[in-house]
């Protein structure tokens, strides 16, 4: 098979088999495809619409090429990483939630990078807080095991991405790689809360993660467009638990966390985001604190620390109120600095 054959097939709106897709991905990720070929394949895939089988095959290739973070004990381990691209410019909700979930007993292997489409990516924010991002996989594992949170800076773990990064920037449209990021956690966390930018991705993501072996996952998209669980609208959920996918809805008013809009969550910089997170962890009872609890609650739930989502939300409120989340945030910063 040539890349030209794959391209012809996609242009004729024919899906690729798992084997074909794996071959195509190997070509793209190994530097054997030219920039023009990479762009053509990515655009043709998006125009056709990526299938669950194609996404699963692509994700498994990316996982196999990633620099792994090896954790022997995966009890209560969870990843929080969304697709981004919701255009809402809110503070780093899933990053803040990671520390709250960890304070509640989850082990968070967070995977993220610098901003692509927002004012502040998780890496931008953590750097502002004084976190050392240049850790070896062993040091990341040590953070997860001792503090409860580890941050994997995506470019350091996905070096094969260097072959496609230039093309992604040049074409500037959403492609398969926006979808793959959250599916390729280098620590292979068995549980995950994953926010998506469109409700059409809820079921496909749940199906892909089932194929990839995830145990308990919540894929979320809020009806106001947010790729997080929202305080200003209902949030649609596709939940994968032990092989079964169920769809349900989260209503913030049921958790005393509903607000008229998202205006209090908007930011212009990583510093703004950090200021909001410090206030939340200082127990400021704000709209920001409410959205952190709704999202951390999901991580606490899928990690297996509690048995219902409602218990997860309550536990998130507790560890913020008693200062445990704030203490853990500071411990994490210090731990990463100790490796410098």
From Swiss-Prot:
Where anthranilate 2 binds, per the record, is at 168
Q: Where does Mg(2+) 1 bind?
A: 94, 228
Would you identify the family this protein belongs to, as annotated? Belongs to the anthranilate phosphoribosyltransferase family.
**Can you provide one Gene Ontology molecular function annotated for this UniProt record?**
magnesium ion binding
On subunit structure and binding partners, the annotation says: Homodimer.
List S-S links within the chain: none
The record's comment on cofactor binding reads: Binds 2 magnesium ions per monomer.
Q: Which of this chain's residues are annotated to bind anthranilate 1?
A: 82
What is the enzyme's class at the highest EC level?
transferase
Known role: Catalyzes the transfer of the phosphoribosyl group of 5-phosphorylribose-1-pyrophosphate (PRPP) to anthranilate to yield N-(5'-phosphoribosyl)-anthranilate (PRA).
Which cofactors, if any, are listed as required? Mg(2+)
Alphabetically list the UniProt keywords: Amino-acid biosynthesis, Aromatic amino acid biosynthesis, Glycosyltransferase, Magnesium, Metal-binding, Transferase, Tryptophan biosynthesis
Pathway annotation from the record: Amino-acid biosynthesis; L-tryptophan biosynthesis; L-tryptophan from chorismate: step 2/5
- The name this protein carries in UniProt is Anthranilate phosphoribosyltransferase
The UniProt entry, under Pfam families, shows:
Glycos_trans_3N (PF02885), Glycos_transf_3 (PF00591)
Q: Which reaction does it catalyse?
A: N-(5-phospho-beta-D-ribosyl)anthranilate + diphosphate = 5-phospho-alpha-D-ribose 1-diphosphate + anthranilate
What Gene Ontology cellular-component terms does the record carry? Answer: cytosol
Q: Which residues bind 5-phospho-alpha-D-ribose 1-diphosphate?
A: 82, 85-86, 90, 92-95, 110-118, 122
- Reported EC number(s) for this entry are 2.4.2.18
Summarize where Mg(2+) 2 binds, as residue positions.
227-228
Top-level division of the source organism's lineage:
Bacteria
- Single Gene Ontology BP term? L-tryptophan biosynthetic process
UniProt KW Amino-acid biosynthesis keyword: yes
Organism field: Hydrogenovibrio crunogenus (strain DSM 25203 / XCL-2) (Thiomicrospira crunogena)
């Amino acid at each position: 098979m040539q890349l030209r054959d794959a391209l012809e097939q996609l242009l004729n709106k024919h899906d690729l088999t798992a084997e074909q897709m794996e071959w195509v991905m190997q070509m793209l990720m190994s530097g054997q495809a030219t920039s023009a070929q990479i762009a053509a394949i990515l655009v043709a895939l998006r125009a056709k619409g990526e299938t669950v089988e194609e996404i699963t095959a692509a994700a498994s290739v990316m996982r196999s090429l990633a620099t792994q973070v090896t954790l022997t004990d995966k009890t209560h381990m969870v990843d929080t990483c969304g697709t981004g691209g919701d255009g809402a410019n809110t503070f780093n909700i899933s990053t803040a939630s990671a520390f709250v979930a960890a304070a509640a007993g989850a082990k968070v292997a967070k995977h993220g990078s610098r901003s692509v489409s927002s004012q502040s990516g998780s890496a931008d924010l953590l750097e502002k807080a004084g976190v050392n991002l240049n850790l070896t996989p062993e040091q990341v594992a040590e953070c997860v095991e001792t503090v409860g949170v580890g941050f994997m800076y995506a470019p350091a773990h996905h070096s094969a991405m260097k072959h496609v990064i230039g093309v992604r920037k040049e074409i500037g449209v959403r492609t398969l790689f926006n979808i793959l990021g959250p599916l390729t956690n280098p620590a292979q966390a068995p549980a995950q809360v994953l926010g998506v930018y469109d409700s059409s991705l809820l079921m496909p993501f749940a199906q892909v993660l089932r194929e990839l072996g995830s145990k308990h996952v919540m894929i979320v998209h809020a009806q106001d467009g947010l790729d997080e669980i929202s305080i200003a609208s209902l949030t649609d959920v596709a939940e994968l638990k032990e092989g079964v996918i169920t769809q349900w809805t989260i209503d913030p008013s049921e958790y005393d966390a509903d607000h008229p809009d998202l205006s209090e969550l908007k930011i212009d910089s990583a510093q703004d985001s950090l200021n909001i997170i410090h206030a939340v962890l200082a127990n400021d009872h704000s709209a920001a604190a409410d959205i952190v609890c709704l999202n951390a609650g999901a991580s606490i739930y899928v990690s297996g620390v509690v048995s219902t989502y409602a218990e997860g939300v309550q536990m998130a409120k507790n560890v913020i109120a008693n200062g445990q989340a704030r203490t853990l945030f500071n411990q994490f910063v210090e731990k990463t600095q100790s490796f410098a």
